[in-house]
Structures are given as C-alpha cells and as structure tokens.
Amino acid sequence: MWVTRQDSVNFQQEYLIENKILDARSEKNTLEIFKSPAFEEIALLNQKQLLLKTLLSQESELLAHVPLCVHPTPKRVLIAGSFNLEVAFEALRHEETQVDFLQKDEKILHSLISFFPHFQETLHHPRFRVIEEIDSLKSYEVIIHTSLLSLEEIAPLFASLSLDGIFITRLENLLLHTESMRRYLLGIAHHFSIAMPFVSPFSLNADSHFLFASRRFHPQADLLLQRADMLEGLHCYHAELHESAFVLPKFLADSLQGSIKN
C-alpha cells in the first residue's frame, strides 16, 4: 500500500506503508497514522500534511533554531499552524524562552502522544503552554507558522509580532510554484525590511520551503554563531546548515528577483 500527497497537478509523492495503526477524527481535523518500513510511522493530517517520524528533527530543528539563533533576546515564541510539538521542544532548548502553542483541537493533539518522541516532556514543560487563541495584548519576538497561509490569513499575525520580531511561515514549493510564490512574496515583503525564502536541505518533503521575514534582523548577517554552535543533542541543525538553507540556485533567484528583500 502507498500513501500519496499531491503537491501540484503535475507532481505527487508516494510513500510505502504497511498498515494503518491509528484513525482519529474531530470536528475539524482527521489524523491517520501508518506503519512505515522506511520511516517507522507516517502521520497524515487532513489528507494533505505528512509527518515522517524518523525525520521529524530535520524540519523541527530548522524551524525553531533559524529564528532563535538570529534574534538576540527571543523571550516569547508563538507556534501555530500544526500539531508538531517537536518544533516547540526545539524552541525550549533556548533558556528563558516561553513558548505558546496555538492549537484548539485537543483530541487530535493528544492522539499524537506516541508519534512525537518528546510529547510528554514538551507538554509538561514549565515554559510551555497550549493556547486556543492569541492574546491581542501580547507580542512575540518570534512567530513560527508551519502551514501555508493566504495573504489575508497572514496579516492578523503581524499585529502580534514585536517591532524587532522574526516571522517564519511555510511557502509552496518554489520550483513547482515559482510565479505564484513570487506574487505571494511581493504581498508580504512590503511589511518587512528583510524577506528571504529558505529550504530544508536534504528534505524528502516537497513542501519544506519557508520564509524568514523581519523588520530588523538578517538571517545570515545576524546569525549568532556561538549560540548556534553551543546547542547540544541536535541531529541536523548547525551554523553552516543555517547559512546554506538561504542559498538559492541562480535561475530561481533570478525568477524571484524583486520579491526577495535581503
């Protein structure tokens, strides 16, 4: 059997599975977890978002440590758009960082208890909390949104970002959707001084393309090398990987010229 994710009308990815080991449904979300010979387990959320258990650290480390190794004082972090608690676990490696995890669907979240290796450790961490809505009076130094948002959906999040904050969000695959992402980046770029796409190196997922945006900080020039190199127990992230994630092929950089602010 195979589980399939389609990233465009001309491109799809298939993963070999053995059997379904969990099927959970709530009012707004569905979760299926399959046994996988290559990745131990594969979680399929809402028939479109795939999480590969053995590769969770690859994306989670990048999403958390890219902004947190650039902002000098990231006291408050908001994570939204996913059930992936591993991003929060990685963010909590940074001392004194408080993490708010925006998620209303408690049923689906707790159905992933055996899928995420650090589920209990994260959920009961003193600097972590699950919230159902954003406090309009609170601002965050870092906001990480792990799903693709429309320009209309993304605008309200800017109100919760501190003036020197860093915003991370997912992009569609830049190779498959170059023109639509160029327009999308143009729509976001006028809010920020820096707006640069980055890619998870060696990722098997076609949707591992993201945006780093800030009014103040540059993801390469302001990288805190000592902080990045002092992190312990990581599988993927390090300072050189961080810098290389922002390097685009020349033809792609040329195609996106004018929409990237670096």
UniProtKB/Swiss-Prot annotation:
**Principal location:** cytoplasm
Output one GO MF annotation: spermidine synthase activity
The reactions it catalyses are: S-adenosyl 3-(methylsulfanyl)propylamine + putrescine = S-methyl-5'-thioadenosine + spermidine + H(+)
Q: What class of enzyme is it?
A: transferase
* PROSITE patterns reported for this sequence: PABS_2
What the entry lists under SUPFAM superfamilies is as follows:
S-adenosyl-L-methionine-dependent methyltransferases
Q: Where in the cell is it found?
A: Cytoplasm
Give the metabolic or biological pathway.
Answer: Amine and polyamine biosynthesis; spermidine biosynthesis; spermidine from putrescine: step 1/1
Query: Where's the PABS domain?
Result: 1-262
Q: Which GO terms describe its biological process?
A: spermidine biosynthetic process
| Residues that bind S-methyl-5'-thioadenosine | N29
- Give one Pfam family: Spermine_synt_N
Name of the molecule in the record: Polyamine aminopropyltransferase
Give the organism, scientific name.
Wolinella succinogenes (strain ATCC 29543 / DSM 1740 / CCUG 13145 / JCM 31913 / LMG 7466 / NCTC 11488 / FDC 602W)
